[in-house]
């Protein structure tokens, strides 16, 4: 009997480990994920290079009270520190590759639940159970900052900046109400978000459709972004670009840390390791995330868009399936295949 009980315990523990390693974390409750009576307090550690283009490892690790971002990194990799306490190498990689005119400017950055933690020392950031700590080795001469990534969806829409969530608002274009309601019901049900049409939210003229005056300012301009909210937006770019916040982000991609964007009727990409932009000829759909002021604690805009209806639907499918994991932004063809 004792042997059977022990075997049952091992099977249960094994099942929990496998469940914790499921590639798709969509729809999980981030307040309890990774914390069980058998496995203890846990967090995810992700290790990539070049803005997520190369996945090195992804592991669920046990954490103790007081563990920092540096502590959990040390559980999955060999970490070497510089004399000033910054990270010099991880698994022997650090700094930039040697080029004709010297080494590239590159460093290790970490993000928490998809939001980059600039100015926060990793040996002082205390990790909480269920959090995702994503370390990436990337160049910093092209993008000074990359505030938000889509690769840990549905974060940061659940947890927000430093576990300070904001009310979720889902806005959709004219032909994407069903998609918006699907995300609400299957992924964000616990948050009970508003679902509104970007053309019919009663918005008025002003920055991002925010109230800027009396009745004389009323307009039919689409209202995709509300300041002070977590905004999940789905629709064709020709509709979404009428929102001033989204248009500004798309036009000044380097300032806002947007590595893939729409130029005219083409989706283009410039990852942190790319000197020049690249046209993605087969891309029709795109998922990107940013903040309205370029700061990690700013108003979040998480955008599912495209240059065709088919592209928008394909981007939504890719996001739901987990195909966009570990990407800063995610471009797809009309069949939902991620363009690497």
Tell me the role of every PLM-derived stretch.
Residues 1-8:
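Bacterial N-terminal signal peptides that target proteins for export
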Residues 18-20:
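C-terminal motif of bacterial Sec signal peptides marking the signal peptidase cleavage site
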Residues 22-29:
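Bacterial lipoprotein signal-peptidase II cleavage site
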Residues 24, 126-340:
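Solvent-exposed alpha-helical segments and adjacent loops
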Residues 30-34, 62-64:
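A structural motif detector for short, solvent-exposed N-terminal "entry" segments of globular domains
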Residues 36-59, 165-166:
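Eukaryote-biased recognition of intrinsically disordered, low-complexity regulatory segments
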Residues 51-61, 67-80:
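OB-fold ssDNA-binding interfaces and closely related basic DNA-contact patches used
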Residues 70-120, 124-125:
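Hydrophobic, secondary-structure "cap" segments at the distal end of domains
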């Amino acid at each position: 009997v004792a042997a059977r009980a022990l075997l049952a315990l091992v099977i249960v523990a094994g099942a929990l480990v496998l469940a914790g390693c499921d590639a798709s974390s969509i729809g999980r409750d981030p307040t309890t994920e990774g914390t069980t009576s058998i496995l203890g307090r846990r967090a995810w550690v992700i290790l990539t290079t070049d803005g997520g283009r190369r996945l090195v490892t992804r592991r669920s690790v046990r954490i103790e009270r007081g563990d920092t971002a540096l502590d959990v990194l040390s559980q999955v990799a060999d970490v070497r520190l510089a004399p000033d306490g910054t990270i010099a190498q991880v698994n022997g990689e650090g700094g930039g590759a040697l080029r004709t005119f010297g080494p590239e400017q590159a460093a290790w950055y970490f993000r928490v639940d998809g939001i980059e933690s600039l100015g926060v020392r990793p040996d002082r950031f205390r990790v909480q159970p269920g959090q995702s700590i994503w370390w990436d080795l990337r160049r910093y001469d092209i993008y000074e900052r990359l505030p938000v990534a889509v690769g840990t969806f549905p974060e940061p829409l659940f947890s927000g900046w430093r576990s300070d969530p904001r009310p979720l608002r889902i806005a959709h274009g004219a032909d994407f109400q069903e998609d918006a309601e699907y995300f609400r019901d299957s992924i964000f049900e616990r948050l009970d978000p508003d679902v509104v049409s970007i053309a019919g939210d009663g918005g008025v003229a002003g920055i991002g459709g925010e109230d800027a005056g009396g009745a004389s300012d009323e307009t039919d301009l689409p209202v995709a972004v509300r300041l002070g909210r977590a905004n999940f937006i789905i629709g064709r770019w020709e509709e979404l670009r009428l929102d001033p916040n989204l248009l500004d982000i798309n036009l000044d991609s380097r300032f806002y840390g947007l590595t893939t964007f729409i130029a005219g009727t083409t989706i283009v990409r410039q990852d942190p390791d790319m000197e020049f932009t690249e046209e993605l000829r087969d891309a029709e759909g795109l998922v990107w995330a940013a903040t309205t002021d370029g700061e990690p604690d700013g108003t979040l805009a998480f955008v599912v868009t495209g240059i065709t209806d088919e592209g928008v639907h394909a981007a939504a499918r890719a996001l739901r399936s987990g195909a966009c994991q570990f990407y800063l932004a995610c471009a797809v063809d009309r069949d939902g295949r991620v363009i690497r």
